[in-house]
Amino acid sequence: MMTPNPDANAAYAKLHVLLVDDDEFLLEIMKVTLRDLGVSSILLAKNGFEGLNTFRQATIRPNLIICDLCMPQLGGMELLSHLALDGCKADILIISGHNLIPPVDNHWALANYNGPILNLAEKIARIQGLKVHASFEKPITREKIIEMLDLVVTFNAPPPAIQASK
């Protein structure tokens, strides 16, 4: 089993994560795993509407959002568009079980796209000014969660101090 590097736990403790996914079982598994890894606060939302409201009403603004793409009511792409309009500065990771085969749902924003959906979603979100670091295909495992957190923590780490030459 993959374990995070010991320095990572201090960095994980600074994360305030918003998980947005319509799969309640996955939300619970991710919440337990994040808590086990030392993440300080975890907010859950079952669809894009809940995610947007949770983000807007949070006492401590999430600094990491992990968002599914295909959800009922308000999907991930629409959620990301609203977050961009709100000026969201959080780090964002996109997850989906529908990377190469879109779901049969004409209401889903990317239902008719013929190609890797995760790559397209990343590009669209970045064009809107969001800080998307990567996307991950489901299933989401403990190892993928550690990879996700390490990616964000490494990106946000201060640059190493440069020692002056003598």
Predicted regions and their residues:
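Non-catalytic signal-transmission and effector/linker regions of two-component phosphorelay proteins
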Residues: 1-18, 122-131, 141-166
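Conserved acidic segment of CheY-like receiver
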Residues: 13-35, 65
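Helix N-cap/capping motif at the beta->alpha junctions
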Residues: 22, 44-53, 76
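Active-site beta3 strand of CheY-like receiver
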Residues: 59-66
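Receiver (REC) domain active-site loop signature in two-component systems and cognate sites
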Residues: 71
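A Lys-centered signature of the CheY-like receiver
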Residues: 138
